[in-house]
Amino acid sequence: MAGSAPEGTQFDTRQFDQRLNEVLDGQDEFFTSYDEVHESFDAMGLQENLLRGIYAYGFEKPSAIQQRGIVPFCKGLDVIQQAQSGTGKTATFCSGVLQQLDYALLQCQALVLAPTRELAQQIEKVMRALGDYQGVKVHACVGGTSVREDQRILQAGVHVVVGTPGRVFDMLRRQSLRPDCIKMFVLDEADEMLSRGFKDQIYDIFQLLPPKIQVGVFSATMPPEALEITRKFMSKPVRILVKRDELTLEGIKQFYVNVEKEDWKLETLCDLYETLAITQSVIFVNTRRKVDWLTDKMRSRDHTVSATHGDMDQNTRDIIMREFRSGSSRVLITTDLLARGIDVQQVSLVINFDLPTQPENYLHRIGRSGRFGRKGVAINFVTLDDQRMLFDIQKFYNVVVEELPSNVADLL
């Protein structure tokens, strides 16, 4: 354990379990044994180049788990985060790892274990993207790839290794992966790893790591085996639980349009514009810059649209939102930052010009609170690169997203 928890975060199992039951029965969205909440990435004291990577990746506002989980991890505390996939767990521990690396030392300093090859490669991708401006070197050690290639890359030097337990243990056993400088150890989807029978390998790996190591455990559920791991590996962990949102996708017809390439999205949107203007609609993109770009493109083609994003001052945003709510403006282009703040009850069409960067945000963009349960239509523009995210969204919410029929106007 690289740091000690501040007073008040000491972990009492009985108290936690009792409080957890209250949370699950009650109205609270989350429970944490750590009280700091940071509502923006800028407030977290992160390195400038890490912030650049976070914003370039398309994040604007931290999710509930990121607001509570990034800072304790950055402080070197042991952290247990219990939340469903899609709540932003990956970016939480990636940010915590990237903040603490010594980039001048080209040795493995962080080891992340994941249950599947696909997830390990996905984490590698996120870690590399967020750490792009810091010059991070990341490698995924997974089964089904060349052992010799793994050895060559590890020999050349990396800052972070992400991998599946089998291949990582093999690399440690062969001494191709040297544990001496590893100071952070993360288990992602711990429950899934245990259910796949990786328990012994996880223990074997842990035995080979330095004694003073920071541990992060991320898991959707906490079965007894996972709790046992936290007891054996961790010291006074900070615990954070995030409940699923109470928004619902019920009554919302969800469709996709295959656009193959990014460049084709604009034409597709223009083809749909007449339909958009029949009703009130919101178009979501992933970055502030893209809001401005798309707004200019639409206006240059004589399409009337409003736009709002986080760079605008609050007063301007309020005026634009007032016009939108009153119905004097009918098509709004925006980012995830405002997804939760838009009173979308009167909006019957949402277009995801860009699919969200994490599944959680899909719900905030198109979901409705059950109290109102208004009907609606959501249209997702899907390039070849987006197909995996669309699959993840369907799996996460247990929904089927169908291809857009030609009579879309009749559905509104």
Curated annotation (Swiss-Prot):
Modified residues (Phosphothreonine): 145
CC terms in the record's Gene Ontology section: cytosol; nucleus; plant-type vacuole; plasma membrane; plasmodesma
Gene3D superfamilies found in the cross-reference section: P-loop containing nucleotide triphosphate hydrolases
Tissue expr: Ubiquitous. Preferentially expressed in flowers, young leaves and roots.
Residues that coordinate or bind ATP: 83-90
Pfam families on file: DEAD, Helicase_C
Family per record: Belongs to the DEAD box helicase family. eIF4A subfamily.
Domain-level remarks: The Q motif is unique to and characteristic of the DEAD box family of RNA helicases and controls ATP binding and hydrolysis.
Protein name: Eukaryotic initiation factor 4A-2
Lineage: Eukaryota, Viridiplantae, Streptophyta, Embryophyta, Tracheophyta
